[in-house]
Regions:
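Membrane-proximal HAMP signal-relay module
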Residues: 1-69, 84-91, 96, 105, ...
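Short alpha-helical segment of the dimerization/phosphotransfer core of two-component systems
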Residues: 109-114
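Conserved micro-motifs of the catalytic ATP-binding
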Residues: 129-134, 167, 171-177
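A conserved beta-strand-to-alpha-helix junction within the catalytic ATP-binding
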Residues: 135-150, 163
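Short conserved segments within the C-terminal catalytic ATPase subdomain
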Residues: 155-165
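Short helix-loop "hinge" at the ATP-lid/N-box region of the Bergerat-fold HATPase_c
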Residues: 190-191
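Short beta-strand/loop element within the Bergerat-fold HATPase_c
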Residues: 197-209
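Acidic ATP/Mg2+-coordinating residue in the GHKL
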Residues: 217
């Protein structure tokens, strides 16, 4: 009797092992790269759908990184090529004395463009990593905006653009440096993409939803079809005139990340 029980126990063990392998085999054979293409147990569908979403998110992040790297390489190469070209011509003595100042100005502008681009990339990297170590404090948005408008006055004067700030003093608990970057970038865009003899109006005040800064201008505007992409890095609505306006294509990305940080 004891021998029969032992035999039955051994048979039960091997039967359970065989049955388990049969049940688990479809799971082992899953294509984890394309989980929804697998034909398996219905109970696994929610798990496979979640895995598919994660795979798509990872792929999107990977594509964004590749695109960002390609854009950075292109944006860095363009001014460096110009600087190298102008410098080589001057080095070889191929510039007339009366053109030296012109070439020097072009080299300076390209160098400033390069510096601005690197600074913007560093700012975005810090915001991405949330490594901004500055403490939050009460910031008077009205006074901050007046300072920013004052800094932009020379740039606005080149196109005879009138800038004005209206509203009232309003405190906001945030990181002053980031708030400065956000408001500055929006106001600078309002100047860059404005028309001659145009106007930029900024309103600062309290609303039912809290403190608010509104910027309006008489500029060329942004076509509706571009609205969803204007916060993407290096995205420009008018690529043909981006260089002459001096933008890096990162300003609104900094605004977006600054807003998310707050």
């Amino acid at each position: 009797m004891a021998g029969l029980a032992a035999v039955m126990l051994v048979l039960a063990y091997f039967l359970a092992k065989w049955q388990t392998k049969r049940l688990v085999r479809p799971i082992y054979e899953l294509d984890l790269e394309h989980p929804l293409e697998n034909k398996t147990y219905e109970e696994l569908t929610p798990f496979l759908e979640a895995m598919d979403r994660q795979n798509k998110e990872k792929e999107a992040v990977s594509n964004m990184r590749k695109e960002f790297s390609a854009n950075v390489s292109h944006e860095l190469k363009t001014p460096l090529t110009s600087i190298s070209g102008y410098a080589e011509i001057m080095k070889n003595g191929m510039v007339r004395p009366e053109d030296i100042t012109l070439f020097s100005e072009r080299i300076y502008k390209e160098a400033r463009r390069l510096i601005t681009l690197v600074e913007d990339i560093i700012k975005l990297s810090k915001l991405d990593e949330e490594s901004v170590e500055l403490e939050k404090q009460d910031v008077d948005l009205y006074e901050l905006t007046r300072e920013i408008i004052s800094r932009l006055a020379p740039q606005a004067a080149q196109k005879n653009i009138r800038m004005e700030v209206t509203g009232e003093p309003v405190n906001y608990f945030g990181i002053r440096q980031i708030l400065d970057e956000m408001i500055y970038n929006v106001c600078e865009n309002a100047v860059k993409y404005n028309v001659e003899n145009g106007r930029v109006s900024v309103w600062v005040g309290n609303t039912l939803d809290g403190p608010k800064v509104t910027v309006s201008d008489t500029g060329i505007g942004i076509p509706q079809e571009h609205h969803e992409r204007i916060f993407e890095r290096f995205y420009r609505v008018d690529k043909s005139h981006s260089k002459e306006r001096g933008g890096t294509g990162l300003g609104l990305s900094i605004v977006k990340h600054g807003a998310l940080l707050h």
